[in-house]
Amino acid sequence: MTMTARTTVTATVNGIEVTVPAGGTILEACREMGTDLPTMCFGPTLTPANACRVCMVELEGSRVLVPSCSRVLEDGMVINTGTARAENSRKLVMELLGSASELDRASDDVSRWMESHRADPTRFGSPADAVARETPTPGHHKPPSLDEAATVAEPAKVEDDLYVRDYSRCILCYKCVDACGDQHQNTFAISVAGRGFDAHISTEFDVALPGSACVYCGNCIAVCPTGALEGKIAWDMKEAGTWDESKQEVTRTVCSYCGVGCNLDVHTQDGRIVDVTSPLDHEVTLGNLCIKGRFGWMYVYSGADAPSEAGGGLEGGRPPS
């Protein structure tokens, strides 16, 4: 007798039957039927890490809530997204993340999700003073007073002309680590250092980025959901209050640096290039680029308009050959 593999599975979500391709997740099923679940660590081109825990749902027969981004949908499952337990869990997690990290530069989706869940990070108290989070001595974290909220605040790291690492906005979603590691770039320039509340993203031995294994592909920037990792030009504009996506145009083109044929989305504002990304659904890039594709456009400016020659492998505004 020949066994035929199932190509679809059918489950019930919020009382409605939904059918999705076999191997799909609960999150995919929810989105298929238009249910808007919050996600912060999920990336469509990355293996789900279920690190942020903001996509939790109720699964009938399960003692605990399950992460919808990573739980594979099975035939006959009965899932509820709007139970009091599930909604309270998502609300609390978003409040904790928002009280510890600055989410002002996260996507508009995050603001919408927090509003729909009535999440109020300020209820934990005013932010505590910043503490040194990078030290060779473990266990340095001092809990704040009861009327203060512990934060991950620290000065932004501006070490070159390409990247800014502003870890006061980091929620430890691990997307940058996965993109730099075996899921995309295979460079392994960054990882998680420290334990507990002291955990943070770090280069090897906490060296400055230009002295690390980083190849400046910018793929970590592309997946960061909160603005903890950003291109220097975008970060400068946001600090100055001049970044305005409503005024930006996106032009699709093909990178000319080599013959691979990576698609580029060139973002312009007021007639100037401010960012370059790649579409997630492009079969070659999956949203990834190299230093030339992501940052090799700076040569179009010259003189006083050109970025400086500091760090990151740029020479006179051009990526190395």
Annotate each PLM feature:
Residues N88-R90, D178-G181, V223-P225, K232-I233, ...:
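Short helix/loop capping segments that flank catalytic or ligand/cofactor-binding pockets
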Residues I16-D75, S89:
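N-terminal cofactor/phosphate-binding cores enriched in small/glycine residues
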Residues K247, T251-L280:
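Catalytic and ligand-binding motifs that coordinate phosphates/metal ions
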Residues T4-I16:
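Eukaryote-biased recognition of intrinsically disordered, low-complexity regulatory segments
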Residues R53, S62-A213, A222, G227-V254, ...:
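Fe-S ferredoxin-like electron-transfer domains
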Residues Q269-S321:
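Cofactor-/ligand-binding subdomain signature composed of acidic, glycine-rich
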